[in-house]
Each structure stands twice: as structure tokens, then as C-alpha cells.
Amino acid sequence: MGTLDPSVCGGLPPEVCEQLMMDQQELIKIKLEKRKWGREVTIIEGLNLDNERLKKVAKQLKSKLATGGTVKNGRIELQGDHRDRVKKLLEEMGYPPENIVIVG
């Protein structure tokens, strides 16, 4: 993975330290919720970003998916079922595929 800072790992072997670092990375969950009158909403949570950066990511996703959406309570809500396409777009934005999980 590259050189690791010894102060971060203490006396742990490099392999163990790398695994611990990977486990601490954000886990992005993409799920579908049904709202009243059967409307579907794609929810993206687990992006550890401040509110402004979260809004920028939401704006990019809404533009590429041609849909409406919002940012509420630290998560992105998009109108419609876009789970597979959102995963692909997040990967294109640089998020590691192993950290993106489609729930349900």
C-alpha cells in the first residue's frame, strides 16, 4: 500500500497496520426507501464529508442522473431507484469499490 508512518502503527507489523487502516475507512451504504404513495428514494449514507462538500456530491449525482434530490441529516436522498448507477458514479468519483455497499 505504500510506506506507513510508524507513529500511527506503534509496534504492529505492517500487514496488521494496513488492515486496521482499511477497516477504518468509510463504508458507504446505498439503499432504497419507499415513501408514501409508493415513491422510491435512493439513500446514500456514510460519506464522511462536511455539509458543503456533501451538497456538491449531491449536485453532481443529481445532474448525472437527471433527478431531484436533497441532503438531509448527513445523507443524500435522490428521487427514484438509482442504486446501481450511484455505485458506478461514486466509483468514478474516486471512492474505492470495496467501501461501497448496496443494501437491500
Swiss-Prot record:
It comes from the Archaea. One of its GO terms (molecular function) is translation initiation factor activity. The keyword Glycosyltransferase does not apply. The keyword Protein biosynthesis applies. One of its GO terms (biological process) is formation of translation preinitiation complex. Signal peptide: none annotated. It holds the Pfam family SUI1. Keywords: Protein biosynthesis, Translation regulation. InterPro entries: DENR/SUI1_TIF, SUI1, SUI1_arc, SUI1_arc_bac, SUI1_dom_sf. Belongs to the SUI1 family. PANTHER family: DENSITY-REGULATED PROTEIN (PTHR12789:SF0), DENSITY-REGULATED PROTEIN HOMOLOG (PTHR12789). This is Protein translation factor SUI1 homolog. It comes from Ignicoccus hospitalis (strain KIN4/I / DSM 18386 / JCM 14125).
